[in-house]
């Protein structure tokens, strides 16, 4: 778990309609310190890190296996408050550490793909989130988070997700896709619809993330994209668990959440680097909007 560190990178930029199958590795970091407004917030979903790889499985180059080690951290809206000062209506402290295994299938025309992911992990002190955030804050000279003694302990968990993305417009510079997904599991249960808009002279229509394939480009290649996401929340055990006492839930979750994501990606030969900004509407009634950034890198092997 000591390998988790707040560093960078998410990847991108697919290429021609016929892509060489390849193996790749990536590192992806998310943090609200990377807020586009210029000031870190350290609240709600405050940091995440993923280290993983993707490997093509057969000669037709249409199926891929992905595997990643991930960690996510959540804190209250004010990390300098002591445990006894925290409001039950604020976001709870929580850490998730988990292993994800995915299976990705493209159709022959490269106009659609389907992805299935299973994640197995743990929460609470065994996630290592408290230790890692405190050490990172000491290294960068930031405030020490004081509320980790109240972190949620939900035990081990399992999450499953199925996602389907289809291209509806692929004309020269402009690409438009639609993504639908459902996530079910011990903690998060939701349904998502998200159109994708991409400006890119490349023939590949999709937004290329670190868990997507990319093809090697001889010349530097730039891609700009936007992804508004609409989410129906069925359940969120992070917000619907009262860590202080039993009884009714202290927070009223919002059933509909909106997230806007905007990214820019640069690919140089077999290396892809991406910078992304996310903005979320409040997840529960007493919450406020939240912004965080993401930086990632993928390398073809």
Residue ranges and their predicted role:
Residues 42-43, 112, 174, 287-290:
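Short glycine/proline-enriched turns and hinge-like loops at secondary-structure junctions
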Residues 1-24, 301:
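Bacterial Sec-dependent N-terminal signal peptides
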Residues 35, 77-82, 202-301:
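Outer membrane beta-barrel transmembrane domains
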Residues 22-60, 64:
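N-terminal ordered "arm"
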Residues 35, 39-48, 71, 93, ...:
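Histidine/cysteine-enriched polar flanking segments
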Residues 71-213, 234-252, 279:
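Outer-membrane pore/translocation modules
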Residues 23-27, 63-69, 114-120, 160, ...:
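Transmembrane beta-strands of outer-membrane beta-barrel proteins
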Residues 47-53, 95-99, 116, 156-162, ...:
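Hydrophobic, lipid-facing positions within transmembrane beta-strands of outer-membrane proteins
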């Amino acid at each position: 778990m000591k390998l988790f560190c707040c560093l960078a990178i998410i990847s991108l930029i697919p290429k021609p309609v016929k892509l060489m199958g390849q193996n790749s590795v990536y590192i992806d970091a998310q943090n609200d310190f990377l807020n586009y407004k210029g000031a870190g917030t350290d609240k709600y979903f405050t940091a995440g890190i993923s280290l993983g790889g993707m490997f093509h499985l057969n000669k037709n180059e249409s199926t891929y296996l992905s595997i990643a080690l991930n960690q996510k951290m959540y804190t209250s809206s004010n990390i300098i408050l002591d445990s006894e000062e925290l409001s039950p209506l604020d976001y709870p402290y929580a850490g998730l550490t988990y292993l994800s295994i995915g299976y990705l299938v493209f159709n022959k025309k490269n106009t659609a793909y389907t992805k299935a992911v299973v994640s197995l992990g743990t929460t609470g002190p065994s996630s290592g989130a408290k230790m890692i955030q405190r050490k990172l804050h000491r290294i960068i000279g930031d405030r020490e988070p004081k509320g980790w003694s109240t972190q949620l302990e939900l035990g081990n968990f399992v999450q499953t997700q199925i996602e389907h993305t289809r291209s509806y417009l692929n004309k020269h510079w402009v690409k438009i896709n639609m993504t639908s997904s459902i996530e079910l599991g011990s903690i998060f249960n939701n349904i998502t619809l998200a159109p994708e808009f991409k400006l890119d002279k490349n023939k590949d229509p999709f937004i290329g993330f670190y868990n997507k394939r990319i093809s090697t480009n001889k010349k530097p290649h730039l891609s700009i994209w936007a992804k508004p996401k609409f989410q129906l929340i069925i359940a969120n055990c992070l917000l619907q668990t009262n860590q202080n006492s039993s009884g009714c839930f202290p927070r009223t979750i919002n059933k509909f959440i909106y997230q806007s994501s905007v990214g820019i990606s640069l690919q140089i030969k077999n290396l892809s680097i991406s910078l992304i900004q996310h903005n979320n509407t409040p997840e529960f009634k007493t919450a406020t909007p939240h912004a965080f950034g993401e930086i990632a890198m993928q390398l073809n092997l």
